[in-house]
Regions:
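PP2C/PPM-type serine/threonine phosphatase catalytic domain
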Residues: 1-268
Length: 268
């Protein structure tokens, strides 16, 4: 089993009209898989956090997820998002557009790599990204990795899973409780790099002091329900690194059937 990857928490400025952000990240292979196909990228200079959960044979999952986070983060490092202080609204809209453009580039390059190398054909990845800009966070999602927010005791899933069972829930065919136990709950309807184009869900959320954002792969929430995840965060004494470590440990204790990755960020 590979050792868990850890990024220590610290305070860093968020770009543009900035606040401060504490963060921690951790990724673990789990107790069953032989390799880790999840990838993480945090760039506190640009305010971007990205998490991807790859899929595909011949190491295709590892390649796809690594390409996704590197390309998206690289776009913001190469072309930093800069706007005058009096253009906050325009900046948020531009942030969302920039994020979509970067994700579209990642999709194209992963897809093209699959065409060039037949053994990687069909590889793809989920992706969730959070771009912190001033008093707002722009969130993008594809697949079944998730973004949650903990605000004043209320723990809420902000993203919608792109899965067959989620569609069944929306059509009233099954309940959310049944969806959690469904054998096909990991069957996704949307992924990055599988087709020449991809639809990305994008939203912009206000950020309040004390808000905690969690980006995670399905290796976490397939093992722990939302109540258990919140319990771990609440009982970490405000220490994000402790919370990240305990989330990984709890998911492994419950079975650790998949790779487990988490990014936690708290606004000051």
């Amino acid at each position: 089993m590979e050792a868990a990857q850890t990024i220590a928490p610290e305070w860093r400025p968020i770009p543009l009209h900035g606040r401060q952000l504490a963060y921690a990240a951790r990724s673990d292979t789990g107790r069953v898989r032989s390799s880790n196909e999840d990838s993480l990228e945090l760039d506190l200079e640009t305010g971007l956090m990205v998490l991807a959960d790859g899929m595909g044979g011949c190491n295709g999952g590892e390649i796809a997820s690594a390409m996704a986070v590197n390309i998206v983060a690289g776009e913001f490092r190469q072309f930093p998002l800069t706007l005058p202080p009096d253009e906050v609204s325009a900046g948020l809209s531009s942030a969302a557009m920039r994020l979509c453009t970067a994700i579209a580039k990642a999709n194209r390059e992963i897809y093209q790599q699959g065409l060039i190398q037949p053994q990687l054909s069909g590889m793809g990845t989920t992706l969730v990204a959070a771009l912190f800009v001033g008093a707002r966070v722009t969130i993008a999602s594809i697949g079944d990795s998730r973004v949650y927010r903990l605000r004043q005791g209320h723990f809420e899933q902000l993203t919608v899973d792109h899965t067959v069972v989620q569609e069944q829930v929306e059509y009233g065919l099954i309940t959310p409780e049944q969806a959690r136990l469904a054998g096909n709950r990991g069957l996704i309807t949307r992924a990055l790099g599988v087709e020449a184009g991809v639809e990305v869900d994008v939203q912009e959320q206000p950020m309040l002091p004390g808000d905690v954002f969690l980006l995670c792969s399905d290796g976490l929430f397939d093992m722990l329900d939302d109540t258990e995840i919140q319990f771990v965060i609440d009982h970490a004494g405000g220490d994000l690194e402790t919370a990240a470590q305990h989330l990984i440990e709890a998911a492994n204790y419950k079975g650790g059937y998949d790779n487990i990755s988490v990014i936690l960020a708290r606004a000051a």
